[in-house]
Amino acid sequence: LFNEDNELIKKKIENLNNKIMILLCVGESKEENKKGITKDILKDQLEVIKNLDLDESFTVAYEPVWAIGSGLTPEPKDINEIHKYIKDVVQSNSVNNLLPSVLYGGSVTDKNAGSFFNEEFVDGALVGGASLDGSTFAKIVNIFNKTKEL
């Protein structure tokens, strides 16, 4: 979006770590998804955290670019698999073996949130357009709370 390379993103994370909650958004394009190289793309994007001592508030949002605002979402089992992969990559690459929270963002609505909130490795959602309507956003929050039994 801003044409930031991994080196610049890594410097930003290093400078902001322990000062604010960092939310790193990663995701693949429709073409990359169709080619079956999603994990390769995510691994490359997650290189920015290699050898960093991450704060426990560090969070990753998986946002498949092809799903944002499209009304399309991956299957819940696929979202879960990708979230597990992201957690594994971050944990193995950070100095302190941090197991991050991973949020899903990509056409999140009150109609589909429950399907992926039920998945083991989905820790929450990064809600875009649906957050503009307070009642819809409240429904998503309630679905999350019921699903995750907070």
Describe the residue ranges of each PLM region.
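Active-site loop-to-helix "anion-binding N-cap" substructures in soluble metabolic enzymes
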Residues: 1-150
